[in-house]
Amino acid sequence: MRQIFQNNYSALGNVTFRRRALERAKEYSSDTPRIKSGTADSISSPKSENYEQFKKANLPSKRQKEKSPLERGFRGVFYMLIILLLSSTLNAQSLQSYQQEAAQNNPELKASFNRYLSELESRPQVGSLPDPEVAFAYFISPIETRVGPQRARISVTQMFPWFGSLSEKRSVSEANAKAQFEQFQEQRNRIFYQMEMIWSDLFEVEQQIRIAEENLRIINTLLEVSLSRYENGLTSQVDVLRAQIEQEDLKTQIELLKDNRRLLKERFNEFRNVDESSEVIIPDNLSASMALKNKDELKSTIIQQNPNLNKLRYREEASKEMVSLADREGKPSFGIGFDYIATGERTDVTNLSDNGRDAFVARASFKIPLFRNKYNAKVQQAELNLNSVQQDIITLENKLETDLYTALRDRSDAQRRFNLYDTKQIQRVEQAINIMMESYSSDVSDFEEILRLQRKLLEYQLKRIQAKADLYMANSYINYLSGVNNITENELNY
């Protein structure tokens, strides 16, 4: 569970769909189906009314005290209030609220956001003129002139790059900052997607525990019935032993599922950056919210909004500016300067006009790039970087398109499997079990066949959960590729 989530789309596909496909491909190694961890939506519980009727028909009934209608009415109102209170509490925190909490507290996101802020600070650095140069010179041996000895010199010089160089540097810095923001956005969306994976895993584990416990209650009923029939000499001890074996298998699997649930909660809290024992309210349903779009619309949305693709586009923009900037750096730069020379008075001449007058000098300088190899290499380097980024954009677009088609295929497959188990297979097995139990009451049906059908029912219920999980995760992955959780700089709250 703590495997590092690689920052590329192929790795995401492996974590989600290939893992799901591998789990679906594995058959249960024994007759008793293994309960897997994953995701699910609201799954109906197995019907147990027939088991209760079967139990009443084969076991001595206990006399119960009849409750008055008034008492039953008060109890019903009380239970309804409890359910309403619990529902409001369970829905107090949704997945979105947990994700927003992670967006505020996750250290990885904070580090990425600080890198974005750091990149913003480079713009005023590269877009400024070079610092002016100030020089002071003192003549140890004064230079004698007609108006007096020159004793000191103060010089001020300001260099200027070629026209447009500073604006090019600012453009490069802005493009790099935007690319870093898209990188932050990609990490934010990736963390949200990982939380959705764990969120669905938590829900599925909870559903699996519920189904396993309901099946355990049914097995307990069958065990009581088989014991009663064995005590009355109507069946052999083998039926009792088989029921006990099924009972222990289910208990073991339930304990494993509870351990998995605890581990998933700890992993979920890592993203929130809270104590690992902090409570996580497991959802009572899953809804894969995604706008119904066709393949072409989804592809267009991904091309426009995917943060990784937008990051490369800003890198391309910066590379284009770098090509122009490298060319401008091969142009001359110039500077202007001003000198002040302090001059002393002559003492050997009287009535000298301008005696001791200070001198003022204006200067202009040029930096001529005569050695062209260095500047030509810079231009070539910038062009190669630009070509590299453009090829990366084409590669990523192709990968995103392939990932989208894979997700759409997995979504269709999950929907078909869910419909199969939800509307056909489970109902057929339940019908067969009901018939077998009625026959067993008449000492006609085989107890082992009842257990086998019960295992088959459990298997189909778990496969229905897995199909719903695959459907949810396929939609979540498409949303991740589409950048549905993208934000703008104005929406940041750090």
Ranges and model annotations:
Residues 81-85, 90-138, 159-161, 165-168, ...:
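Bacterial Sec-pathway N-terminal export signals of envelope proteins
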Residues 100-110, 117-131, 154-171, 182-189, ...:
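A glycine-/polar-enriched beta->alpha junction
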Residues 111-123, 187, 191-211, 228, ...:
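Amphipathic alpha-helical coiled-coil segments
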Residues 20, 48, 71-73, 82:
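Glycine-biased, low-complexity coil/linker segments
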Residues 190-303, 315, 407-410, 414:
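Periplasmic alpha-helical coiled-coil/stalk elements that build and connect Gram-negative outer-membrane
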Residues 34, 38, 42:
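Short Gly/Ser/Thr- and charged-rich N-terminal loops/segments
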Residues 102, 112, 156, 202, ...:
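Hydrophobic/aromatic residues within transmembrane alpha-helices of membrane transport systems
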Residues 135-171, 282-292, 324, 337-374, ...:
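Small/polar, glycine/serine/threonine/aspartate-rich low-complexity segments that form flexible
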